[in-house]
Amino acid sequence: MKKFLSVALTALCFTSTAEAVYEAKSDTGTEIFDYIENRRREAREQKLTEEQEKLLADIAEAKERLPQEPKEGDPVPAVFEGDDMVYYSGSGEFIATGKVDIIQLDGYRFQSERAEGNVKEQVVRVEDKAHVLQLTPGAPRVTLDGYKTVYNYGKKTGTMGNAHGKAGEYYLTGKRFEFYPDHIVVYDGTQTKCGAKTPDYHLSAERMEIWPEQVIRMYNVKFWIKNRIVGTKEYEENQLGEKEKNHFPRVGYNSDHGAYIRDTIEIPIANHLSLDINAYVETKKGVRSNAELKYKNRDFRGWLKYGFYDDSDNRWIQKEPSLDLWYGRHFGKGIPLSYSVEAEVGHWRQRAISSTHQEYEVKLMHDPIILGKYALILNTGYKITKDNAKNVPNGETTVRGSNYSVILAREFDERFAAYVSFSYDKNNSRNSVFNFDVDDYSKKFQSGVSYWLTPKDRIVVGVKWNADQDKFDDIDYYWYHDLHCSQSIVRWRGKRKKLEVRWEFTPW
């Protein structure tokens, strides 16, 4: 099972929203490579482009040429350049033509072939194409190309028509952009993380808002695959840097269940409250879906769950229903630790076994300890599991015990990574009523390697060792292949001789 890895990856999620986990489905601990790949991807996204580096260099040079330092409260200085400039000192009007370049020293660049405006009013007007670059601390990095632009660089307000560009990792288009000091509004816009000229998927919205706290808010949203609408929603909110959201269907095949399709439909009910329909249909056993009434507010989560759930071994459980409450947070103030408390109580069913099931767990997780190319991840916890099954011998059970894991991962280079781990969990299939999300033993070693064969192809091998009985337990082989803006994953369960193939749009 992947229980101990989920604890470790929860710790990674506490450290940064940019490290939210895009999980591989693994039984041998290979999820740690998702953390490594997400971190590499984040580093690439945070790297400045050539034009962003040039803007910072030009700002630094312009500041050196200022006759005096601006006082607090003074307008932010701007620098104007062009092949030909005409300035009317009386009115403040100007006309600039040929490689017009306007830099505002707090991180803005405005470029066009012709611009008019008024220096006294601090207004720039461009009828034809204009290029805008925003690189201000704490705000999303924005690059836009559009038409019929009017911009007041003093008030930081303006408009742009028929524009396209990028905010953070999102590619945007819009019929009209409005600029305000603290946010950007897009009307009749689209957004996607797919950088293709014709993206495989995108979201459209009547109105989008891009806020400095790295948030995109969208209203009256449609979800598209190519040119077909696959869903609608009144409101959607994305965090820039978020990797875990995937709005689109996932399809696949495995030896146990045949071909299948998964999709998640989120229905907003009230502030912080939604109904999630996790739809799942397979060819062998039909519909196995679930529904969750979800509450999410800051560090607290709550779910009322009903339906079918599967683990990494394709074992299924029915929750009829189950209430799951979770609270977790980072200690902060220089303390590299996070903690969480979780309780789940409900009626569970697995084949002929049914029980009132209770789980209570507290976890303590250390932030990843980075030692050069090594990452050390430590966590521990204590869990109480109670069952009261009436239809099986010894169905009334209580299991109390600790769990912990130690994971050491190394990035040898941009292509090659490896890990080794040891974990202990008191809960296992021998002392549990339900054979779900637990191993057959308590102590295990896991290790694996990941290697990029080509820029689009990665192979992963993960192995698991039963340390209770000192015997080899499992081996998984993976082939990840990047397709445009989606990914296919082939998994071969070496010891079990089982195949699984998945295809899904990538959430980055």
Model segments located where?
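Long, low-hydrophobicity, solvent-exposed regions enriched in small/turn-prone and acidic residues
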Residues: 2-5, 19-125, 130-143, 153-508
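Bacterial N-terminal signal peptides
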Residues: 7-15
